[in-house]
Amino acid sequence: MEPKVNNFEFSEKPEIVVHETDILLIGGGMAACGCAYEADRWATEQGLRITMVDKAATDRSGAVAMGLSAINTYVGQENTPEDYVRYVRNDLMGIIREDLVYDVGRLVDDTVHLFEDWGLPIWKKDEEGHSIDGHTALRNDMISLREGGKPVRSGRWQIMINGESYKVIVAEAGKAALANNREKTGVEQNHFERVFIVKLLSDKNDPTKIAGAVGFSVREKKLYVFKCKTALLAAGGCVNVFKTRATGEGQGRAWFPVWNSGSTYAMAAEVGAELTMMENRFVPARFKDGYGPVGAWFLLFKAKATNAFGEDYQETNKEESRKLYGKYVDSMGTCMRNHLMIIDMKAGKGPIKIHTDVALQKLAETMTKKEIKHLESEAWEDFLDMTITQAGVWAANNMEPEKVPSELMPSEPYLLGSHAGCAGLWTSGPGDFGPEEWHWGYNRMTTVNGLFTAGDGVGASGHKFSSGSNTEGRIVGKMMAAYCIDHKDESVEFAEDPEDLAKEIFMPMETWGKYSDYTTDPNINPHYIRPGMLQQRLQKLMDEYVGGVGTWYMTSKYMLEEGFYYLDMLKEDSYHMCAENLHELLRAWENFHRILAGEAHARHIHFREETRYPGYYYRGDHLAIDDENWKCFVNSTYDKNTGEWNIFKRDYHQLVSDADKS
């Protein structure tokens, strides 16, 4: 096949827009909005320009786009940041960056208080101890959390909210900050929506320093080149890299947002940023097919889950699991709960069901009819606030969860760093808590000078959720302002010419223009592959060789090495992707990002010779947890010029004692 050259002979050349700023925010989710809010407080009065570039529309972008029914990280007066570290460490199987987690724990409550100040309805306890939903609490002028109001806890760390418009509220604060910066600095535009950043740009004279980013509009034929002094890369985690349980027309239904395409991990790796714990993944066990949340049902409504024989699989499978996983079975992290469920599913003891009907009937025994009606209403709102599709699945199948139990199912794997997972980038810590080797500069700065990350981007420190991600964004906003002030006399220069970047990025459209008429069916063509087809190949490869749902999350050294062969073939073919339109160009570049993020994941699993996260993945040739050799971080760097990975260990340090007040 002839090499691809783009001289825009067969497609329209895009308009090239160059935008200079000081602080560049890539992403528009919870982390980026928090960063915009805080950066405005510190940077605007210094005359520093802030620019946000969002792949979507900021009001409904990011993982919180559909809404949430709970804030999963609120420390409160009854807990301490040290308690929070113990909780996260326990759930992530003993290996976390405790400095980063502690840093979130001591700051996150202030962020939640801001959410309430901005209008987020938060459930409260009244003087008699009754639970009052957020809307009623607002109408009744109940005191705020900041003033000492008591939230309704669905778990030790979770508080209930009426959160359908959660992201809209947080986005409004971020956009107001951008508007203030725009007015004070006199720039015409500093908020770009529907612009997909696909590559970071390093400084020509110092490749270890960030200089900007480049992307394209998904609505207009425009290439955007952003030059900056410092950048936040907060473009979410990675979904649709593995074959999905949902198929056909339902393939878009996943637990994590399908537009998260691994951009954070891939773009950072390409400019030399160090990755950490990319072997980690999250496999949420949720309501089958709808992926609705189970947390409120388990924690607030006290529902129980059993196998088809009515057995509590978490109890019946404990003893056998201790042989491989010892103390980790008793500490019962999220992955271990998955593992105990999977044992029964593989043994034919499914379906696994959560008894929502029994839970509501038990609660109703001590309630009035009015209270029961309100409880059922809140149970439904739990889904309408954050996973409308779950309500749709129940309705389509003539199921009433208050009358019948519902199936649970572990999903396909996702890569993330903000929920019950810890994949991401290796970043500098706060400096006042932790060893010197964890603090080499500004808080949450990567190993690339001037490049920061937050939320799903910060590795080895999961369980931030929405509030913690926004908190990390706020931390970064202040740090980015400090970085700009400290480096005010420095300038950056691109190594790449914008014209050449346009040729590279729009190559798939040139390929389509040149070859689409070669065959009668544009989907079957020897000169190109369409992005949808390439994605299916990637998902099949990852599923079969890297431990997806098709193998019950099982892989091994030999399976991975076989997968690497096919991955190399896939990467070779990826350069022949075509794009009929801007949307397909978006899909093509999402694939480039997914391929690199997926490869990082596979190579980290190959390097770590143990099963650190049973229930998320299994190394069939190393089924046990091996604390003696592998209680450490697995980190890596990628050389984009050679395609080679350097994977290595970094020491784990325990900073918070095991003692727990509970």
Briefly describe each language-model feature range:
Residues 1-23:
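Extreme N-terminal leader/targeting segments of oxidoreductases
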Residues 18-21, 220-230:
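Core beta-strand elements of the Rossmann-like FAD/NAD(P) dinucleotide-binding domain
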Residues 43-65:
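Glycine-rich FAD pyrophosphate-binding loop
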Residues 201-224:
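Conserved beta-strand-loop-beta-strand element in the redox core of flavoprotein oxidoreductases
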